[in-house]
Amino acid sequence: NILQFRKMIQCANKGSRAAWHYLDYGCYCGPGGRGTPVDELDRCCKIHDDCYIEAGKDGCYPKLTWYSWQCTGDAPTCNPKSKCKDFVCACDAAAAKCFAKAAYNKANWNIDTKTRCK
């Protein structure tokens, strides 16, 4: 679920960067996505997008699926409940952890995706 994902991001990065910073970053962070990721953070978003696609193939609705999780230290941890909930939670938790490890390059925020994402 998008709202839970936002909170997971805050958990993983210890509140150092608001989730909205990732909405228009690179070629894959935010709606849509195409081309080659511009950096490691953008690659995290592509992996997350691909994970959601796989969840959809399994009959799940990733953007709408509510799941159970908790913030343990600086790591989101999923609480197993059902196949879809676990799948989507794992997608979001992995992405949040990936975001926390990747550098944020302000030059890759709000880029011209038509020219840079081929």
From Swiss-Prot:
Residues holding Ca(2+): Y28, G30, G32, D49
Cofactor note: Binds 1 Ca(2+) ion.
Keywords: Calcium, Disulfide bond, Hydrolase, Lipid degradation, Lipid metabolism, Metal-binding, Secreted
GO molecular function, one term: phospholipid binding
Catalyzed reaction equations: a 1,2-diacyl-sn-glycero-3-phosphocholine + H2O = a 1-acyl-sn-glycero-3-phosphocholine + a fatty acid + H(+)
Matching InterPro entries: PLipase_A2, PLipase_A2_Asp_AS, PLipase_A2_dom, PLipase_A2_dom_sf, PLipase_A2_His_AS
Cofactors demanded by this protein: Ca(2+)
Cited SUPFAM superfamilies: Phospholipase A2, PLA2
Main subcellular location: secreted
Active site (record annotation): H48, D92
Protein name in the entry: Basic phospholipase A2 PA-15
The species this protein was found in: Pseudechis australis
Lineage: Eukaryota, Metazoa, Chordata, Craniata, Vertebrata
